[in-house]
Amino acid sequence: MTSTNSRKSAISKSWPAPAKLNLFLHVTGQRADGYHELQTLFQFIDHCDYLDFHITDTPDLILHSTMSDSVADSDNLILKAAKSLKRYTQYEGGAHIWLEKLLPMGGGLGGGSSDAATTLVALNALWKTNISPNKLAEIGLTLGADVPVFINGLSAFAEGVGEKLITVQPPESWYLVIVPDVHVSTQAVFQHPDLPRNTPKLDMSSLMTQQWSNDCQKLVTTKHPQVANALSWLVEYAPSRMTGTGACVFGEFTHSQQALDALAKLPADMQGFVAKGMNKSPLQIRLEQL
């Protein structure tokens, strides 16, 4: 159930649902079941949605948001995650969940998957159901291919459909992220005939040392001039590329002030923010504070 009620008192301290960046994204093939084989590098940033939870003795799961229309997809994943954990653990109580939605939908930042992961991690802790991280990741994978990396909570090289994870430590750079005013459908990108699907598969050490790119970028910038314009502007200030299937693009900076200086010059018709790369996610840090 979804409600537009405002946030209540007597709830848990907020749990972050961080954004991720795909520092590179290669499409190496397509399986018989239609899913695409990927090689990608996930890193978290300190820009997040926030969720609050109030545990109840009654079995209802109720989601509250003041932005219910614009976050319908995320709402659905949050409730699906809560129901999946409740079903697996046979937990008899429920929860009221409050969502503060800050991450854009259809931006390639993983907002919906991150919301689902935070719901699983937080409710597992608050319900004291004691499900292992590996089992939580299995439950998360049924909700979306990106959910396990958010549950894992560490920057990772990923293969398969994105679920095979190897922990890595890329530089924790500063990023200027631009949010074009367009929603890009992940499904539409992966179904498009012009998407490259034959990038050679490389070992992790080779991938970590080469110039990084995103196989979805050419298609998306061709279809969405807002994304192309954002990249054209940003690349003047820093090495830049698209995250995920877009629409967000990011430029990489060594120091925060460099990113802030570029942000100050952002054209009036563009929106963006500065964020810090994090190899341990804000969610993982929050969990360790319990």
Curated annotation (Swiss-Prot):
Pathway annotation: Isoprenoid biosynthesis; isopentenyl diphosphate biosynthesis via DXP pathway; isopentenyl diphosphate from 1-deoxy-D-xylulose 5-phosphate: step 3/6
This enzyme's EC code(s): 2.7.1.148
Binding positions for ATP per the UniProt entry: 104-114
Keywords (A to Z) from UniProt: ATP-binding, Isoprene biosynthesis, Kinase, Nucleotide-binding, Transferase
S-S bonds: none
Keyword Ligase: no
Active-site positions on this chain: 20, 146
Pfam families (UniProt xref): GHMP_kinases_C, GHMP_kinases_N
InterPro entries, alphabetized: GHMP_kinase_C_dom (IPR013750), GHMP_kinase_C_sf (IPR036554), GHMP_kinase_N_dom (IPR006204), IspE (IPR004424), Ribosomal_Su5_D2-typ_SF (IPR020568), Ribsml_uS5_D2-typ_fold_subgr (IPR014721)
Gene3D superfamilies for this protein: 3.30.230.10, GHMP kinase, C-terminal domain
Gene Ontology molecular functions: 4-(cytidine 5'-diphospho)-2-C-methyl-D-erythritol kinase activity; ATP binding
Catalysed reaction equations from the record: 4-CDP-2-C-methyl-D-erythritol + ATP = 4-CDP-2-C-methyl-D-erythritol 2-phosphate + ADP + H(+)
GO BP term, example: isopentenyl diphosphate biosynthetic process, methylerythritol 4-phosphate pathway
Task performed by this protein: Catalyzes the phosphorylation of the position 2 hydroxy group of 4-diphosphocytidyl-2C-methyl-D-erythritol.
UniProt record similarity statement: Belongs to the GHMP kinase family. IspE subfamily.
Protein's UniProt name: 4-diphosphocytidyl-2-C-methyl-D-erythritol kinase
Species for this entry: Shewanella frigidimarina (strain NCIMB 400)
